[in-house]
């Protein structure tokens, strides 16, 4: 028997549990010859960019142990790392993702997607059930059955094969135009719209909404743009928090340097009124001493007139 036939390769592993079976593939949890857990995938398709994943290992996708492609029989056999953890879908259903953890996952996933797109690969089936959260909290993207190399000829051709999952796949993935990295951006937005809580900050909602734009030109053009937008949103949040802290501090400084005069009590008002009356009484005598009164002026005038008359008689 040819050592590279599908049957021979499959016999090198002990099947434990069927994980998934469809028209596109069959996936088994297996033991290898050393007794280690692994995932065996028989994909009824060829030309997938899985060799690029094998040659460029990353924590964002499973490590590929073995890859065999038979173009005549039109199948690809993949033995890959078994990822210990729970799917993002399970976390969403259990409602065990806090808002801060959701944002952290969003950022980490964008970093991983940036690495994937740097290889020229688009996944085309990003959804919560295809994201496994490891025990250390990091996300891993699985199921590359629909993956392909991104086309550099944007918008001039359309995908002839309808792939992906309804509700997560963008419009262009259903024959409107060719798919590219922005198609993964769309699915990413739909996914994390389900992860992040409804009361998330406005700027975070705005980022997710832009990811999901109908027109690819209106979306973020790559994962790096999303990371910059998330960093900006965090900066605005920090500055807003500092402003809220600064307002009470500024008010305190104002009251210390420029204290407001207290409203006088009734007793203080009475004392102030009494003091004013006393001052008025002191001013009145002083006014009398300052010059002759009207009666004194009249008497002086009369004496002056009488004296003048006496002088005239003598003369």
Locate each region found by the language model.
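AlphaC helix of the protein kinase catalytic domain
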Residues: 87-97
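Activation segment signature within eukaryotic-like protein kinase domains
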Residues: 105-106
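Catalytic-loop of the protein kinase fold
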Residues: 113, 117-133
